[in-house]
């Protein structure tokens, strides 16, 4: 990812992963800036990632985030940038800003264990137009 994201500053190599296919879809949809369903790609790709048994996955401590963390990109970026710089783990479990009690994972492709994280499968999924009736109304995709 080249642009800044919720958990990192611009220019830092990082890969965002979702805990579940449904949350991955929500993460894609929330970032789309397309005014009409017909402008969407026919499908998105869902990648399943596998890790070797000894790859360390850190969890973000509960007290690391303040009550308004969803609106404080400076704070979440500082946390992610510090984790990337620390090289403590190849993966960091972080909360989803979209859905309570759901996690996302940050993957540091520059970590020494990065080669022990691999793509297990790739599947193409079509966008279901019913999603856009809910999101934007009348077949229009919205934010």
Predicted regions and their residues:
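Long, hydrophobic N-terminal alpha-helical segment
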Residues: 1-43
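Active-site and NAD+-binding cores of ADP-ribose-processing enzymes
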Residues: 35-143
């Amino acid at each position: 990812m080249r642009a800044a994201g919720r958990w990192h500053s611009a220019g830092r190599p990082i890969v965002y992963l979702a805990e579940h296919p449904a949350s991955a879809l929500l993460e894609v949809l929330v970032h789309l800036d397309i005014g009409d369903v017909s402008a969407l790609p026919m499908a998105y790709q869902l990648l399943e990632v596998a890790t070797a048994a000894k790859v360390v996955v850190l969890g973000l401590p509960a007290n690391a985030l303040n009550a308004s963390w969803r609106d404080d990109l400076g704070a979440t970026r500082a946390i992610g940038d510090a984790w990337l710089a620390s090289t403590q783990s190849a993966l960091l479990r972080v909360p989803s800003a979209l859905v309570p009690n759901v996690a996302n994972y940050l993957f540091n492709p520059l970590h020494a264990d990065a080669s022990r994280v691999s793509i297990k499968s790739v599947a193409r999924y079509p966008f279901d137009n019913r999603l856009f009736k809910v999101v934007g109304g009348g077949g229009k995709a919205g934010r």
